[in-house]
Amino acid sequence: MSTNDNWYIEHFQPTGSAIGFRISGKLDEVQSLFQKIEIYQTTDWGKLMLIDGAVMLTSRDNFFYHEMISHPALFTHPTPKRVVIIGGGDCGTLREVLKHPGVESATQCDIDEQVTRMSEKYFPELCDSNHDARAELLFDDGVAYMANCPAGSVDIVIVDSTDPVGPAEGLFNKAFYESCFKALKDDGLLVQQSESPLALLDLIKEMRTEMGKAGFQSFKTLPFPQPCYPTGWWSVTMASKQAKADFAFRQGAAQAKGFETLYYTAHLHTGVLVAPPFVAKALGE
């Protein structure tokens, strides 16, 4: 990470590359109990949030991530009513989940309250649903929350975390996935951000292996553009308890959705289920 000549530059060692944003000023900085959160004003990308020097989101392109970690799973599950979000402190995923009228409750559990408070202040458009009667915001350890979640009580678990280091490290292992497996109903789905398929396919393979050890039987990794993240290409991985699940989705419902999205569509969902050949080969699909 470096800041010079009015540019913020994040270096990405796995690919020997970097991504940068021209900035006009620093708006805020908070050192929480867990991490350093910074907010910058950019010249072209709106506001920029960093956590421990890594880009988390910008005003301009966060919709790619928030829509793709939410809507594919919600339209794949037959009747998603109870959703748990682990992480997601910026509240963008919660907003997308609660666009679905059939969702009866959505609990967001993020260990760091300061992420949410900074988002409320600088990204208020992401926090539109924070006071929805169906929303519950908890500031606690997501690993402990899932370990204590009643068996068979959840339809979808969304793991919207930072990279698998620091506070998020415990969200990428067999023990955590076992807790998710236990909490999910038989037709439940786990969906987790799974980094860049261009640079970190080995990490995606490891995640899927650990999910399998925890009992999940079928997996689907969905790539999508994310310009503000290293390589500009990101992914989420869905896991099902069902053997040989094809991850078919409720296409009619997706086409007739009564809410606006900026990236996700039913046609796009159909296409993203077909992995690029190099991804399919690496993941054994």
From Swiss-Prot:
The active site is at 160 (proton acceptor). It comes from the Bacteria. Pathway: Amine and polyamine biosynthesis; spermidine biosynthesis; spermidine from putrescine: step 1/1. It catalyses: S-adenosyl 3-(methylsulfanyl)propylamine + putrescine = S-methyl-5'-thioadenosine + spermidine + H(+). GO terms for molecular function: spermidine synthase activity. It is found in: Cytoplasm. Gene3D superfamilies: Spermidine synthase, tetramerisation domain (2.30.140.10), Vaccinia Virus protein VP39 (3.40.50.150). Pfam families: Spermine_synt_N (PF17284), Spermine_synth (PF01564). Spermidine binds at residues 66, 90, 160-163. InterPro entries: PABS, PABS_CS, SAM-dependent_MTases_sf, Spermi_synthase, Spermidine_synt_N, Spermidine_synt_N_sf. Keywords: Cytoplasm, Polyamine biosynthesis, Spermidine biosynthesis, Transferase. Belongs to the spermidine/spermine synthase family. Catalyzes the irreversible transfer of a propylamine group from the amino donor S-adenosylmethioninamine (decarboxy-AdoMet) to putrescine (1,4-diaminobutane) to yield spermidine. Homodimer or homotetramer. This is Polyamine aminopropyltransferase. It comes from Xanthomonas oryzae pv. oryzae (strain KACC10331 / KXO85).
